[in-house]
Amino acid sequence: PSNMNYLTGYDAWSFYYAQCVIVHVNADEPICFVRNQDAGGAYIKTYLKDENIIKYHEKYIHTWPLHPYDALVDLIKDRKWDKLSVGLEMDSHYFTAYCYEKIKQGLPNAKVLDCERLVNWVRVVKSDTEIKYMKAAAEISQLGMKKAFEAINPGVRQCDAVSEIYTTLIKGTPEFGGDYSSIVPMIPTGKGTSASHLTWSEDKFVEGEATIIELSGVNKKYHC
């Protein structure tokens, strides 16, 4: 999802269904391949021409053995790209083993390779605009941590404290608003501090017990 956003601007909350971006070395623009009902998000949020936003039919959703990548394979064949080298983000979140099998079986004449985090390596070098977003995220993160120190007190329910933290992180500042983060606030307390990634509960904070606070400020999807 993050690399789709980086390459096209697409950022709808649809990553739990099969979707992808195709980058051809000789094409002027990438192709954004999304579910039919999510195409509107691509039209709104990306810079792509309409013809480079390809939507697949709802019949491919939860109708095993049909799969959205059946439509993707057909797209690649229609473009006469099925005998080329095809680089995949093999360790990408939400790229399942079934996605891989559909591509491998559907494109027997292609040379299927691991692109070895190619887009991620490009993303390492940040533009001035990206650094601006990251600095904004840092300010929001500071506000969130300050609110955590204020809200976490003995006798306060963990969920009540987190609701104040969340509000602060999303509200941001008068200059720039916050965005949702890739993780929820982690707030293990007491014996929970022995486990790094526990979230909140309805239990109350207890005087004398330690609490770990992990959160992230976000601006335009850039985290700090």
Which residues make up each language-model segment?
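Short catalytic-site patches enriched in acidic/histidine residues
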Residues: 4-14, 116-121, 125, 157-224
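A composition/biophysics-driven feature that prefers long, compositionally simple stretches
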Residues: 1-143
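Generic secondary-structure signature for well-ordered alpha-helical cores
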Residues: 77, 108, 136-146, 150-157, ...
